[in-house]
Amino acid sequence: MIKEETVSYFQTFDGVMAESDKEEELDATKAKVEKVREENEKLKLLLSTILNNYNSLQMQVSKVLGQQQGASSMELDHIDRQDENNDYDVDISLRLGRSEQKISKKEENKVDKISTKNVEESKDKRSALGFGFQIQSYEASKLDDLCRQVKLANAENKCVSSRKDVKSVRNENHQDVLEEHEQTGLKKTRVCVKASCEDPSINDGCQWRKYGQKTAKTNPLPRAYYRCSMSSNCPVRKQVQRCGEEETSAFMTTYEGNHDHPLPMEASHMAAGTSAAASLLQSGSSSSSSSTSASLSYFFPFHHFSISTTNSHPTVTLDLTRPNYPNQLPDDYPLSSSSFSLNFSSPDPPPPSSHDHTLNFSGLRTQAPLSTDSLLARYRTRLSGQQ
């Protein structure tokens, strides 16, 4: 009986202790929740304060930026008005771009001063606010973007003006060359080579690309147009046309222009002949046609040639189908006492002298010296083949 009472007593005591422990834990949890709630209230208050400060700072920065943009636009308008007022004092030298560069430099210096001043003022005003958050909004970077855009525009204007300067100088130089040519009466010369061959084009050693073909009224046979493909910018053109029905095996090849690249050795012989004819025709444009014919006879004693200066393009025709050579060379033709060379570098050939005879092919940069014996051997080989 006593044991049962003791057991029931201990059970009751344990239940009371368990309930007291639960109440203590609940009180501790409530205290923690209350503490967290107080901290949340403090954080909310701090966040609202930060937002209010940010909004006020943003309004002040926007106001300052508006004032600075207005001042910079007024400065630029003032510069534009000064430029318009000074337009009537600009000399013809504006074509060379000197005054434009000075104006652009002055404008760039003024814009740099304005941007530097505005940045310093904005920094001072930001530090004077004293909020200490160092918040940089989107509007705060607008001024820097505007200054960068103005500098980029000035740089582009400089590039455009420099390109215009180079183009104006080139145009002036080209105009001077044209006036010089008009005064001296120089015209682009053409050299026609008439040869008998089975192929429609003479194997002159150069590489050509066909770019057109048409039929003329005077000759029903088609005329093909080629350009030199050994260089991308080579201005040399040639026309190939069969002569006529009575001479079906003869082709007329017309060369025009000057090569701007080195030629291979197999192309030097034809280039020497055509360049000599063109050079002598140009050098004889101011003299009589008889002197020009005498010079051509001196350089080409083996073939028939004709000169045509009536059209807009003075033309020399070398007829390789009709040999016009004597039994022996002329008495004044140089053999041992003089040198005979082909110089492909000088654009203005010197007139032939009694001791040194040079054939110039303007625009070329290679040299291919030929001796007198080798030159005569080539001519005799060609003449024997035609017979």
Swiss-Prot record:
GO molecular function, one term: DNA-binding transcription factor activity
Record flagged with keyword Cell membrane: no
Low complexity bias (residue ranges): 329-346
Gene3D superfamilies the record matches: WRKY domain
A GO cellular component entry from the record: nucleus
Pfam families attached to this UniProt entry: WRKY (PF03106)
Keyword flag Nucleotide-binding: no
Keywords carried by this UniProt record: DNA-binding, Nucleus, Transcription, Transcription regulation
Highest taxon of source: Eukaryota
DNA-binding region residue numbers: 197-264
Segments for region (Disordered): 322-366
Localization annotation: Nucleus
Protein role: Transcription factor. Interacts specifically with the W box (5'-(T)TGAC[CT]-3'), a frequently occurring elicitor-responsive cis-acting element.
Protein's name in the database: Probable WRKY transcription factor 36
Organism, as annotated: Arabidopsis thaliana (Mouse-ear cress)
Lineage: Eukaryota, Viridiplantae, Streptophyta, Embryophyta, Tracheophyta
GN (gene name): WRKY36
